[in-house]
Structures are given as structure tokens and as C-alpha cells.
Regions:
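Conserved ABC ATPase "signature" region
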Residues: 2-17
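Conserved ABC ATPase signature
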Residues: 21-25, 29
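Hydrophobic anchor residue at the start of the ABC signature
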Residues: 35
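Conserved catalytic motifs of ABC-family nucleotide-binding domains
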Residues: 42
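Catalytic Walker B motif of ABC-type/P-loop ATPase nucleotide-binding domains
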Residues: 46-49
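H-loop/switch region of ABC-family ATPase nucleotide-binding domains
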Residues: 81-82
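A short, surface-exposed alpha-helical micro-motif characterized by mixed small hydrophobic
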Residues: 87-89
Length: 130
């Protein structure tokens, strides 16, 4: 319904843009609109691939808050990120891949405090392995 659409636009901070074509929105606004569209159908699983890449701080924080809120409501969220800070803030469990191979699957707290592989340790610390 129109009311649901307006509610989702409010949630992502775009309610005043309801009549503006998506192509005229900034990158951050388009990301927020994409998330609103995905949430509108109320999926049980949400797949997000780098949802905050190149976003302004306002959009980044808003999207992270929505992700946390949806997870608290019981929604399963699979998030791809290279941002270790974001992974720390949002993840309950980490699947760490390197060169397409799964190297670790563990609770987020364990990943950041006791990584099992040198690749994970290096990535967490921002070092490059040769």
C-alpha cells in the first residue's frame, strides 16, 4: 500500500523524495532506496553485498542501524563486506574467505580475538601477506 511505501521511505530518510525519480538520487540515496525496496516485501533472508561502500557517514550509519534493527526482529542477514569495523559492529558470525576459499567460520567475537589462520590475522591487522 502507499502508506507502507511512505513508512519505508521514512525509515531510510527519503520520505520527502517520494515523487523524485530514482535516477536523480545521489549514490547514498539510491543505496537507501534499494534497501527500502528490499525490505518492503518482508523477506525472511536479506542478502547484502557491500551495502555501504562509498557512502556518506549519514547513509552508512542509517543503513547499519536498519540492518541491526532487522536482525533484532529475527531476519537472517548475509552481509558481504571488506570493512572489518563494519563486520565487528554488525556480525554475529563470520565466514572468512580468501581467494574464494572458506578459511574460517566462527562467532564474530572469536574471529576478532582468536583468528585461526594467518590470513585472517593479517586481514584483521591490515597487513598484506606475500
Amino acid at each position: 500500500s502507499n502508506l507502507e511505501i511512505i513508512n519505508f521511505l521514512q525509515r531510510v530518510g527519503l520520505d520527502t523524495y517520494k515523487d523524485k525519480p530514482a535516477r536523480l538520487l545521489s549514490g547514498g540515496e539510491q543505496q537507501r532506496l534499494s534497501l527500502a525496496r528490499a525490505l518492503l516485501i518482508n523477506p525472511s533472508l536479506l542478502l547484502l553485498d557491500e551495502p555501504t561502500t562509498n557512502l556518506d557517514p549519514y547513509s552508512l550509519n542509517l543503513i547499519e542501524e536498519i540492518i541491526l534493527d532487522e536482525n533484532k526482529k529475527g531476519k537472517t542477514i548475509i552481509l558481504t563486506t571488506h570493512d572489518m569495523g563494519q563486520a565487528k559492529r554488525l556480525a554475529k558470525e563470520i565466514l572468512f574467505f580468501d581467494k574464494g576459499k572458506l578459511l574460517e567460520q566462527t562467532k564474530a567475537i572469536n574471529f576478532f580475538t582468536k583468528p585461526k589462520t594467518k590470513e585472517a590475522q593479517s586481514y584483521i591487522n591490515g597487513k598484506i601477506l606475500l
